């Protein structure tokens, strides 16, 4: 997951950036996750990769702030796609976690690109609130998520056909 979610975007950016800098206006969009701002039990490697991607996008946005390259970061919550295997779908159902249709995420991407130069956008309620709270009061989020830990562990032990996006 680190290679796909973090190393590949960094390497691709390194190759594309000289071309993008030749234009008056260009954009880089990094698609992260709510889990790039909130460490979630059962998804340590995935969260680490998305935390890294968010940090990379934030740093690059600041480094390129005096250029024509706009750096954006989109953080969807769970999205209903084929990338989610049965374990993730079942876990989300058990936790009552909403899963957005890809068209919702696409709409959020368009809104991100229409917004301020170089910005972040978090998708979904209450996830976007949790991201903000986690930034200033992480222990509060720890307490809120602690009640879900037994469910996460139960699903981690069950046998489901695995997918590459799952822990």
Walk through the language-model features, giving the residues of each:
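Active-site helix of classical SDR
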Residues: 13, 49
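Residue(s) in the substrate-gating loop at a strand-loop-helix junction
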Residues: 33
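Alpha-helical segment proximal to the catalytic Tyr-Lys
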Residues: 18, 62-63
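A short helix-coil junction within the Rossmann-fold of NAD(P)-dependent oxidoreductases
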Residues: 15-24
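Active-site loop immediately N-terminal to the catalytic Tyr-X3-Lys motif
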Residues: 40-44
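A hydrophobic alpha-helix adjacent to the NAD(P)-binding/active-site core of NAD(P)-dependent oxidoreductases
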Residues: 1-2
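C-terminal helical subdomain
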Residues: 73, 93-131
């Amino acid at each position: 997951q680190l290679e796909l979610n973090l190393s590949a975007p960094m390497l691709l950016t390194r190759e594309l950036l000289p071309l993008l800098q030749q234009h008056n206006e260009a954009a880089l969009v990094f698609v992260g996750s709510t889990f790039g701002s909130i460490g979630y039990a059962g998804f340590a490697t995935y969260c680490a990769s998305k935390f890294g991607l968010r940090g990379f996008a934030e740093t690059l946005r600041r480094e390129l702030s005096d250029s024509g390259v706009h750096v954006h970061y989109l953080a969807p919550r769970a999205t209903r796609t084929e990338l989610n295997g049965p374990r993730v779908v079942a876990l989300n159902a058990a936790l009552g976690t909403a899963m957005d249709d890809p068209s919702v995420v696409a709409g959020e991407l368009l809104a991100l690109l229409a917004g301020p130069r170089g910005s972040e956008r978090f998708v979904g309620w209450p996830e976007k609130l949790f991201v903000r709270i986690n930034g200033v009061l992480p222990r509060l989020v720890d307490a809120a998520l602690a009640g879900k830990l037994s469910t996460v562990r139960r699903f981690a032990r069950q046998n489901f056909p695995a997918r590459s996006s799952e822990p």
